[in-house]
Design a protein with these regions (language model features):
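Cytosolic juxtamembrane amphipathic/interface segments immediately preceding
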Residues: 195-197
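Hydrophobic packing positions in regular secondary-structure scaffolds
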Residues: 1-192
Length: 197
């Protein structure tokens, strides 16, 4: 109701301008609360409307619905020096780079590589040689609580989200998943005492 009041006050165009500054998963959450005609109009005004629309196809309680597309991928066929050069050009925000994800030419998740390993490895070394292949991932349809528990179990800062073929789709961060665990714990507590939220 507050969101609908806000839209009446500022309009779809202004809402879209504000949403341009927010992560895709948050934008998707906001758009899900709009009426269908407002959803379509807002998506049409967003520069990254197609990406947000893809997130909307997943349930809000799934890993796909909560994932962010703000992550860095590196192709396993490049050298360490090429990876470093790419990162220098890309200049990803430090608050988004928990892991560097290594993919094959099709986009299948192969593993992760740390910035430390990039720095200490020979520039000519293939990224495939230093990739940590023991990576824990969830599928886009995984329930958010299960994804949060996986992240917690392995003490990760972020967990990659893949499709059914293993292609990297997005990343869920610990920040997102801590909120999920808190919500789930609250729901469980209410159920235990016989109350609904």
């Amino acid at each position: 109701d507050e969101l609908r009041d806000l839209i009446r006050g500022v309009g779809i165009h202004e809402l879209a301008a504000v949403l341009e500054e927010v992560e895709d998963d948050v934008v998707a959450d906001v758009i899900q609360q709009l009426e269908p005609d407002q959803q379509a109009e807002t998506l049409a005004q967003l520069d990254r409307g197609d990406e947000v629309a893809e997130l909307l196809q997943y349930g809000g309680e799934s890993a796909g619905g909560l994932m962010s597309r703000g992550f860095v991928t590196l192709n396993e066929d490049i050298s360490v020096q090429q990876a470093i050069d790419y990162l220098r050009v890309l200049r990803p925000p430090s608050d988004r780079v928990y892991y560097l994800y290594v993919v094959d030419s099709v986009g299948h998740l192969q593993g992760t590589v740390s910035i430390r390993d990039l720095i200490v490895s020979s520039p000519r070394t293939s990224l495939a040689e230093i990739t940590q292949r023991d990576v824990h991932a969830v599928t886009a349809n995984t329930d958010q609580e299960e994804a949060a528990l996986t992240l917690q179990k392995y003490n990760l800062l972020a967990i990659p989200v893949v499709d059914d073929e293993g292609i990297l789709e997005g990343v869920m961060t610990a920040d997102d998943l801590i909120d999920v665990l808190q919500e789930e714990a609250t729901e469980d507590m209410y159920r235990m005492v016989g109350l609904d939220e």
